[in-house]
């Protein structure tokens, strides 16, 4: 029986992992430059956490979560990172330790979506969460953080879509306005949207069904219903975005797919590339009621997440696999024994090493060293070991020499780590 990876879940092989390392490293650096520290939360959370915070009528909760019951506990493999971060913030009473908290995370998420280009059932997200700052300046800086990161990794063609959902009173007025708009045309809506109409008509705006798009085309805008405080906040966000020079558009139809958002929300969409319908690179917004909803104090918060697979498709160029600085080619038992010791010494000095322990012919080992892009091939034959020497073949300069076995590790390390002629090989 042939076993394959679960549909929508992919293996990431070594030739691709280097690109992932590059992307993850760039995100860590960028987040830490903005004062964020890494947090790691469990893959499994109580199912109620997501049902309560993301919304019972959202597609994620209704159709896409991987949930199960074990020993009386109802558990879900996390579909996103914000709810878990907020749960950790409350559980560890972080609010009592610092007035403003900035966290970032990277890791896998899981949703039972229909797989498509740039959309998977196991996917990786990088995100930031900021607790404790309610102001529009904070919102604009968060959006600018995302835009700056995309520019850092070479994704230059994108635009930020922004909207405001207001506070609770504004959303209630908007709910009534949407009911008045949709109810006379209920029969034209999809079955899912007809069912959601009374409970949460905002979800209709986020529907992917073309029938709902048609009915929503002339739906009222929440921006027309903002109260004075929400209006001042919204104006402040746009003013700060203008100051920062962020390329953005006001998108009155933007609501995103989760119920916990308040006031500012945003999506970053690619304007070039081959993502098709999956053009959203990042998204987020403010969720000022979540911490209190989890039993904590009233703490404002804002965050975002980015799909890393989509970012990788947009990043220019490919990262080569890390090459060994030294390839050790032992010939005979004494050579093999000495190669084990030498490899350990070189690695302790920071040199990537590959040791060929198959006991093959020298010609085959040289071909292997060359195919790996090694800088040096070190030949350890029994006769050379008996004389206290070893052979070095420089695969860039195409020269071969003999050096004493004693002190060889330091000599090899210096050679392997120096910049080669042309800069084509060697350890990175």
UniProtKB/Swiss-Prot annotation:
It comes from the Bacteria. CDD domains: HisRS-like_core, HisRS_anticodon. It catalyses: tRNA(His) + L-histidine + ATP = L-histidyl-tRNA(His) + AMP + diphosphate + H(+). GO terms for biological process: histidyl-tRNA aminoacylation. The keyword ATP-binding applies. Keywords: Aminoacyl-tRNA synthetase, ATP-binding, Cytoplasm, Ligase, Nucleotide-binding, Protein biosynthesis. Its EC number is 6.1.1.21. Disulfide bonds: none annotated. GO terms for molecular function: ATP binding; histidine-tRNA ligase activity. The keyword tRNA processing does not apply. GO terms for cellular component: cytoplasm. It is found in: Cytoplasm. Homodimer. Belongs to the class-II aminoacyl-tRNA synthetase family. This is Histidine--tRNA ligase. It comes from Sorangium cellulosum (strain So ce56).
